[in-house]
Curated annotation (Swiss-Prot):
Residues with the Hydroxyproline modification: 112, 115
Signal peptide: 1-26
UniProt region (Disordered), positions on chain: 85-120
Positions annotated as glycosylated: 35, 115
Keyword set, alphabetical order: Developmental protein, Differentiation, Glycoprotein, Hydroxylation, Secreted, Signal
Gene: CLE9
Family: Belongs to the CLV3/ESR signal peptide family.
Protein name (Swiss-Prot/TrEMBL): CLAVATA3/ESR (CLE)-related protein 9
């Protein structure tokens, strides 16, 4: 092997080891269920951060928007709750039961009325 291939191999192995170390330290920085050592750590969406509370505006079912201290966070919480409430759709009405054609004893087919869309 030439010297450049050896240097490239060493560089790749060092990068791999540093990534492994970084991922292991990121998972160990969580002190307990809510407290974290870094102020910005809770804003990360890293794969080692628990999925249930990885977003700064995540509202748990027992938490109200009044518990947020910052006004922006509180207004964002209220807005997200409003969006969530409006996104819940009413259950769709079931389609009417099919009409049976008395002449043939089969379901009636709906025929569109109005102008022919294929006619120019």
């Amino acid at each position: 092997m030439t010297m450049t291939h050896l240097n490239r191999l060493i560089l790749i192995s060092l990068l791999f080891v540093s990534l492994l170390l970084k991922s292991s330290t990121a998972s160990s920085t969580v002190v307990d269920e809510g407290n974290r050592t870094s102020r910005n750590f809770r804003y990360r969406t890293h794969r080692f951060v628990p999925r249930f509370n990885h977003h700064p505006y995540h509202v748990t079912p027992h938490r109200s928007c009044d518990s947020f201290i910052r006004p922006y966070a509180r207004s964002m919480c209220i807005e997200l709750q409003r969006i969530h409430r409006s996104s819940r759709k009413q259950p769709l009405l079931s389609p009417p039961p099919p009409e049976i054609d008395p002449r043939y004893g089969v379901d009636k087919r709906l025929v569109p009325s109005g102008p022919n869309p294929l006619h120019n």
